[in-house]
Amino acid sequence: MGQKGCPIGFRTGVTKKWRSLWYGNKQEFGKFLIEDVKIREFLRKKPSCQGAAGFVVRRMSGKIEVTIQTARPGLVIGKKGAEVDLLKEELRKLTGKEVWVEIAEIKRPELNAKLVADNIARQIERRVSFRRAMKKAMQSVMDAGAVGVKIQVSGRLAGAEIARSEWYKNGRVPLHTLRADIDYAAASAATTYGIIGVKVWINLGEKASTASSNVGTAAPVVQ
């Protein structure tokens, strides 16, 4: 059952950076964690953040800084920054604290597992053949310079009575090599036959440990 581990969590603190950058004592930790979850759930539901690949939450002296990683920064910023200002105000009401919003543009969306998974899911919802969507995505990922890619879809594929899983793989995608920079994400497609799950693994090559000194620490450390 060694394959069941999440590649992101497995490498956090080794070659992957924390997505929550703050420290909380016993009294604060639970409150901060729940607040983080609420912030992420709120942002995922916002139309302006639909193209976002991830969110990084950082806390400092009563303030919260949220970094939105997206391939479409213009959509998040809005006309003359209107969308960002609205996000700040809504997050301030949600948390009761001052919130800063930063935008980090993803230069190569073809190498981001979350964006690739979401793209496949949206195609399946538009009734595009799941095999065609998978193969096209794999080709785009490899053309962008990835070392390897694996894509899996699960559910009532093509309306079949019995749910099953199918996957395609190209190149190398090691699961237990910590120095391998593996990006992983999952998405879901809502179809008339039910939910179709999509998982994507992208091998970006080997990477030296960037946080070896943080391994075993009790809480996230600001990078």
Swiss-Prot record:
Q: Does the keyword Ribonucleoprotein apply?
A: yes
Tell me, in a sentence or two, what this protein's role is: Binds the lower part of the 30S subunit head. Binds mRNA in the 70S ribosome, positioning it for translation.
Task: Indicate the quaternary assembly.
Answer: Part of the 30S ribosomal subunit. Forms a tight complex with proteins S10 and S14.
Q: What is this protein called?
A: Small ribosomal subunit protein uS3
Q: Which keywords annotate this record?
A: Ribonucleoprotein, Ribosomal protein, RNA-binding, rRNA-binding
Q: Which GO terms describe its biological process?
A: translation
Q: Which PROSITE patterns match?
A: KH_TYPE_2 (PS50823), RIBOSOMAL_S3 (PS00548)
A GO CC term attached to the entry? cytosolic small ribosomal subunit
